[in-house]
């Protein structure tokens, strides 16, 4: 009787220790509990070996999921560290809206933004000259992170496209970029619609607040489907001030705008070159 009690206690203790290992592995990898348990069992409780097994299985799962249709997701605002680095909108896709709302998907969007910003800064914005090639390059850089996300989400995830903000050629000096994201869940700059606006400072060295730049981005997101001359539209939130007057009041002139809603074609406005 005493022997049976001892072995039962030992079995319970071993089970508890094993579950602690499962919890630790899940915390480190974010893989499903069932996958963590199976990997630890196969690795005889060796944490490092179990992580290697999960990584290999994640790659295999990613390969299987690679051809799955991705029709849901979010758009991501990416503004370079300096105006010369440029700005762009990344479209990130998943198979379901449920997965796109997952915290791991959202964090992977942030990782993609950080990597693209590094490329933009390193090339002084030149990487955006070929958006398709930029998307491919970013996908290659993000390969391991995307495979890890696929393993956690259990469905495909990919970088669909990169849309660059292209300033008007005749208005490329003293540029500033405003950004606004609509439909954010819990990560800034990741949402359903992103608006980027390039403006030029009239007075050099004047400090333009981030709130002012965000406001102009918000206006173009709110009015992206409007027809006609943007300068004569009422500024979003104002019944008396037009966009042109609002910009003049803040010492700015419009260069270009880019609004991207997930799943739709981007809306672009570019300042016309003045007549000679």
Swiss-Prot record:
It is found in: Mitochondrion. One of its GO terms (cellular component) is mitochondrion. Disulfide bonds: none annotated. It comes from the Eukaryota. Keywords: Elongation factor, Mitochondrion, Protein biosynthesis. Its main location: mitochondrion. The keyword Protein biosynthesis applies. GO terms for biological process: mitochondrial translational elongation. One of its GO terms (molecular function) is translation elongation factor activity. Transmembrane segments: none annotated. SUPFAM superfamilies: Elongation factor Ts (EF-Ts), dimerisation domain, UBA-like. This protein may be expected to contain an N-terminal transit peptide but none has been predicted. Associates with the EF-Tu.GDP complex and induces the exchange of GDP to GTP. It remains bound to the aminoacyl-tRNA.EF-Tu.GTP complex up to the GTP hydrolysis stage on the ribosome. HAMAP family: EF_Ts. Belongs to the EF-Ts family. This is Elongation factor Ts, mitochondrial. It comes from Leishmania braziliensis.
